[in-house]
């Protein structure tokens, strides 16, 4: 997907809470919104070059969203609203081999007590619920999720098992918001219960897949399937 809004570079200073950060822009300290409640500690370091997207909402307190940061020479998108849009574009273009048998895409559909990012439908009553998780954490070429404990994420996995037991297909797709990673694995050191739930989901025939992305200053596109190591 292409970003059509104005994108500018700045320098990260600090992040006092999950929703706000201070950056240096054109020599001045500016408060910006952070559209990601994860920690992003490996990316948002003092003096790191980051990208801001200009926003013009009437009721906004800030003019910019902090959407990406450079980790050495690697640009990593951190906007939590982006993964679903990237995956939807890839689904529409039939770029994800697991889902090419489905021809109808519905967003934000409920099953049981959970709302999933996508419900896919195809011929012969084929149906699949898909949950997308955006991945921003990378260490030594290994992409991991989550970067903060997520009880909600664990519950999604358990509900996907129920989807599968009901006779429909179920999948979780980890969208790695960068390129050049070796493989993906659950971040057990941060959230052991999530890792256990992911392995349990796989054992119960929930599809677990990961894709990386080409990320530029004004675009992000789903790229290649990445090995999942559980």
UniProtKB/Swiss-Prot annotation:
<dbReference type="InterPro" id="IPR041465">
    <property type="entry name" value="SfsA_N"/>
</dbReference>
<dbReference type="Pfam" id="PF03749">
    <property type="entry name" value="SfsA"/>
</dbReference>
<dbReference type="InterPro" id="IPR005224">
    <property type="entry name" value="SfsA"/>
</dbReference>
<comment type="similarity">
    <text>Belongs to the SfsA family.</text>
</comment>
<dbReference type="GO" id="GO:0003677">
    <property type="term" value="F:DNA binding"/>
</dbReference>
<protein>
    <recommendedName>
        <fullName>Sugar fermentation stimulation protein homolog</fullName>
    </recommendedName>
</protein>
<dbReference type="Pfam" id="PF17746">
    <property type="entry name" value="SfsA_N"/>
</dbReference>
<dbReference type="InterPro" id="IPR040452">
    <property type="entry name" value="SfsA_C"/>
</dbReference>
